[in-house]
Amino acid sequence: MRNQLSILDVPVDVITMKEAVQRVQNLYSEPGLHTVVTVNAEMVMRARHDKELHQILKQADMAVPDGAGVLWAAEQLGQHIPERVAGCDLAVALLQEASQHKTPVYFFGAEPGVAEQAVKNMEALIGPLQVVGIHSGFFDEQEEVNIIKAIEDGGAKLVLVALGVPKPVSYTHLRA
């Protein structure tokens, strides 16, 4: 059972980094696609006026507290989140686990060349990764079909999406 709180009707998991990594690893064995979002104050405020984003955040499999503003808001509501789970830190922790367990990873998003450099940087930091694909965040509708096929055909268990809010959230939700 998930322990969540609500900030302006946006669910946020009360979770530590260690628990978040474990939860993602558990999601690998569950059928279907899963969405993990990193909730910060900007997303909470945007969701107040963007019904699509609001629905996506509410339906995510995990919504980690990414930002001091989220922790502060929880305290103002008389609730406590044990720690900030920043998206970039979560990505590093998940990639460390992926390196150890040879989990297939797909890097998706950012400007051309950025994801490739991210792979090099991460491998220098944590060791070899089983990268099954890389694609920048610039694509048309036909390429989108090919990207989805590459992710599926490559058997990626972890897809890191860096497209900027609200595009990555919308993208991962629509493809789930």
Protein language model annotation of sequence segments:
Residues N40-A41, A110, L163-G164:
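Short, well-ordered beta-to-alpha junction loops that form the rim of enzyme active sites
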Residues T172-A176:
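Conserved small/polar residues in nucleotide/adenosyl-binding loops
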Residues A74-A150, G154:
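Conserved beta-alpha
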Residues W72, P166-P168:
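Short glycine-rich, flexible loops that bind phosphorylated cofactors or substrates
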Residues A63, F107, L160-V161:
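Conserved SAM-binding loop
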